[in-house]
Amino acid sequence: NNPAIAYLLEGNSMVDQKLVMAHVYAHVDFFKNNFCFQMTSQGRDARDASDVRKWIDAMANHGAIVRKWANRIGIEKVEQFIDACLSLENLIDPQKPFLPKDFSPKSSDDEQEEVETPEVPLLRVDREYMESFINPDEFVEAQKKKLADEAEQALRFPVAPERDVLGFLLENAPLQRWERECLAVVRAEAYYFLPQMQTKIMNEGWASYWHSRLMTENICDASEIVDYADRCASVLATTPGQLNPYKLGIELFRHIEDRWNKGQFGKEWDDCDDWELRRHWDRRTELGREKIFEVRSLYNDVTFIDEFLTEDFVLDQKLYSFGYNERNSRWEIESRQFNEV
């Protein structure tokens, strides 16, 4: 929503309220600035006509649509159809929000005429007795098969694979009006929440990074710091075999900030293989804060991890590969190798 709206639970303690506000403010900053959310922050819904800057209203409209058809068709029938749609809600195209909006696949109503297979183009022969040598049966059959495959490809629908399965169904499936409207609701919301899935680690890491700084440097007083530390520890706790996006995100942002503050980047750093020199490397460049704001804007989880998850970070954070030992009935470290992690 624009402006963003957040809610506080009335029964929370004051420490919890402060923590939630600090955390949510950082989330809002991420929503407003990360490229994955640019369609929502600019008011463009990638796949339908609603203005996503007013998603409080859009969600209310979606609810009104569903209730309208539930009253007319029956709540059980509508719920069953929506459940079926929700089972497909991840079958959308992550790239489509960044493409032009002129999404117009061929209509299934268009009659496709049967395509006749053209005659096989034979090589010219001046002498009839040379025909079997110049155009042998194997060659003719191969050419016939090639032409038949091309004719079949021309009849295929859609001609090219379509990643946005929900959009394809919306445009081409023989749906009743109420089914089409309900499917459009599910699809619009799937696209709206897509950036959340693409940036879960970064988003939670950014919010945790800033709530940690705000709470310890500006907001908490001495009487609240222990309670805050207890709440924060429970959020950042990790267990073997599980990935905590809050913990991984905050530590990776801190790692980036520390590296760029010390100048641990660039060709000279990459080419250095002296472990002792790397351990004490500090060029005092102080570019860490600038770098993490750049990362916040230009990366998603895949590129974030691919670019900044280094072997040094894995060793420092003990991000080992765990496996379950059935003999001991417990999780154990299987590998400490960076590539396997």
What residue ranges belong to the model's regions?
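Active-site-adjacent bridging/hinge elements
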Residues: 1-3, 173-190, 225-226
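Post-HExxH zinc-binding segment in Zn-dependent metallohydrolases
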Residues: 31-108, 208-221, 234-245
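Active-site-adjacent structural elements in folded domains
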Residues: 152, 168-173, 191-197, 236-240
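Active-site recognition of the HExxH zinc-binding catalytic motif
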Residues: 15-32, 204-212
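Short pre-active-site segment immediately N-terminal to the catalytic Zn-binding motif
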Residues: 3-20, 194-202
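Non-catalytic terminal regions of proteins
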Residues: 15, 227-341
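Long, low-complexity, polar/charged, intrinsically disordered or flexibly structured peripheral segments
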Residues: 109-172
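Hydrophobic/aromatic-rich, well-ordered segments within soluble, folded domains that form packed cores
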Residues: 186, 194-217
